[in-house]
Amino acid sequence: MSRARSGKVNKNRHKKILKLAKGYRGRAKNCFRIAIQKVEKALQYSYRDRRNRKRQFRALWIQRINAAVRQYDITYSQFINGLKQANITVDRKVMADLAVHNADSFVHLVELTKKSLAKTA
C-alpha cells in the first residue's frame, strides 16, 4: 500500500492563505508562517469592525439628526420623544437622509413633532 502524502492539500492550503495575504507588507505576503498569523489577525479585525460599523453609523445618524433639528429650536431627545408621541415610525437612517437630502420633508416631520409635544405640555 502506498504512503498517503499531503502535497496537494498543503499546496492548496498555502495558496489559499497567501492569496488572502496579497497586498501585505514584507514577508507577510509570501512567508506562510507569518502570513497565516497576519491573515488570522486581519479576519479578527474585520469581524470586530463589522459590528463597530453599525455603532458608528448609528452615532453618525444621531449627530446629523441632532444638528438638523437644532436649527428649528428643538433637541434630539425632544424630537425623538415627539415622534413617539405622534406615532411616527421612521428609523434614524431615513431621518438622517431626509435631513441631508430632502429638507422640506424633514421640516414637516419637525413640525409634526412640535405639535405633538405642544399637546402634551
UniProtKB/Swiss-Prot annotation:
**Keywords, A to Z?**
Ribonucleoprotein, Ribosomal protein, RNA-binding, rRNA-binding
Molecular-function GO terms, alphabetical: rRNA binding; structural constituent of ribosome
Tagged with keyword Ribonucleoprotein: yes
Give the CC-aspect GO terms. Answer: ribonucleoprotein complex; ribosome
Q: Name one GO biological process term.
A: ribosomal large subunit assembly
Q: Which family does it belong to?
A: Belongs to the bacterial ribosomal protein bL20 family.
Q: What does this protein do?
A: Binds directly to 23S ribosomal RNA and is necessary for the in vitro assembly process of the 50S ribosomal subunit. It is not involved in the protein synthesizing functions of that subunit.
Q: Which HAMAP family match?
A: Ribosomal_bL20 (MF_00382)
Q: What is this protein called?
A: Large ribosomal subunit protein bL20
Please tell me the species this chain comes from: Orientia tsutsugamushi (strain Ikeda)
List the taxonomic lineage.
Bacteria, Pseudomonadati, Pseudomonadota, Alphaproteobacteria, Rickettsiales
Which gene does this sequence derive from? rplT
